[in-house]
Amino acid sequence: NEWAAVAAARAAVVGGFKGTANLLAAQMYGLNAIGTAAHCFTLVHDDERSAFESQIAALGKNTTLLVDTYNIEEAVKTAVEVAGPELGGVRIDSGDLASLAQRVRNQLDALGATNTKITVTNDLDEYALASLQTAPVDSYGVGTMLVTGSGAPTCAMVYKLTERENSAG
């Protein structure tokens, strides 16, 4: 049913979630719209730096930048260069989340962004959340497994097809 995600978003907030990344549910039910940019947002820019600059120009330095589209270490460096040490947060959406969160935390601290938050996403279920308890993670983006339920089949993949004309025409 095409309305299942909207209903699930409302139910999650009723159940204690801070908000939803489902913009239709947020609009329909007056919920707090939260979330970060998608990989396609980064891909439609000439490079990661210009994507980060665009997001910060629109949402301010307190936004959360997605840092795993290309190279996480380079993205974190670029994010702090663009936003400064007051960058609100970074999001990791793939790979070994616990290990990457630790590496990113160390890098952020070394760059002076000691208050920058780390959010992890990627088909998180109760087992993944339990495995992340000792990782330096500030928040979790839970969606797929919340809506479908643990044990139900899902398609854990991202297809990043993007076409655009570059700035040179």
Residue ranges: model-predicted function:
Residues 1-114, 124-131, 135-136, 148, ...:
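Buried, small/hydrophobic-residue-enriched core segments of structured protein domains
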Residues 35, 119, 139-142:
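Short hydrophobic alpha-helical runs that function as membrane-insertion/retention elements
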Residues 38, 94, 143, 158-159:
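Generic secondary-structure boundary/loop-capping signal
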Residues 138-155:
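Glycine-rich phosphate-binding active-site loops on the catalytic face of alpha/beta enzymes
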Residues 150-169:
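C-terminal structural cap/anchor segments
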